[in-house]
Amino acid sequence: MVYNMDFLIAAMVILLLILWDFLGQKRADDLNNQIFLFFAVLGILDVAAELLSNYYISSGGGDFGLAAMLTTTVFYLFQALLPFTLICYIVTLHDNKMISAKKMLLPALPTFFLIGLVLLNPFTEKLFYFDLTEGYVEGSWYKLMYYSAIGHMAAAFILIILWSRRMGYRKTMVLLEILVISGSGVVIQFLDHSLLMTGFGLSLGILALFITINNPNVNTDSLTGVYNHLYLTR
């Protein structure tokens, strides 16, 4: 299969620019911004791993066997972590001081299970494996990665609706838009694996967060550069 990596390259450019701008500006040092920063960095690592994985897979050379297995496994690990990170981000908008470990235990269990499957995959070959003649081959449990992403997005949707009054109309609408954008990327790639849209949808979602909820300029006065009342009411 020939993969179209144009969207992945665009996603990498978008995410790097977001990270550069976010780190270069004065910002509120709260839990939500910390999770956003982690989310953005994880997104960059995810896209980078997918680019390398698809490069080695597409090369088809026997010398790239180990590199293809390693980069693809790392990419799958990031894919397992990203949906849970989105849940954590939403929770910080509800509990902006501290995340309860007990509250996060239940949504973390599917993620831990999926990470275990990814780490054991070189031995079980349930998610993917490499064949000398066919190259990259999807395993019998391959679609579990997509089901996990969709399931976490469904859980995120429920949390957003339940906590909409606490978070406010603006944040609620932004989060719902992000679910639509990111979810569309997952669905498109699920229907056509050659279109690598998951990373692109992720980058657009993080961009939407950056220019709205996590915009550093929102919390500072344009003349003095000090925090304004919006920072104090976060």
Say what each PLM segment does.
Residues 63-73, 131-142, 198-202:
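Non-cytosolic membrane-interface motifs at loop->transmembrane helix junctions
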Residues 6-86, 107-125, 175-190:
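Hydrophobic alpha-helical transmembrane segments of multi-pass membrane proteins
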Residues 214-234:
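Conserved nucleotide-binding and Mg2+-coordinating catalytic segments in signaling enzymes
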Residues 89, 101-111, 131-138, 150-162, ...:
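Alpha-helical transmembrane segments of integral membrane proteins
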Residues 17-22, 85-89, 146-167:
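Alpha-helical transmembrane segments in multipass membrane proteins, preferentially the mid-helix core
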Residues 162-217:
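Interfacial "cap-and-anchor" motif at the non-cytosolic start of specific transmembrane alpha-helices
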Residues 22-36, 91-104, 161-172:
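Membrane-interface helix-boundary motifs at transmembrane edges
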Residues 2-10, 117-155, 189-195:
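Extracellular-loop-to-transmembrane junctions of the mid-late helices
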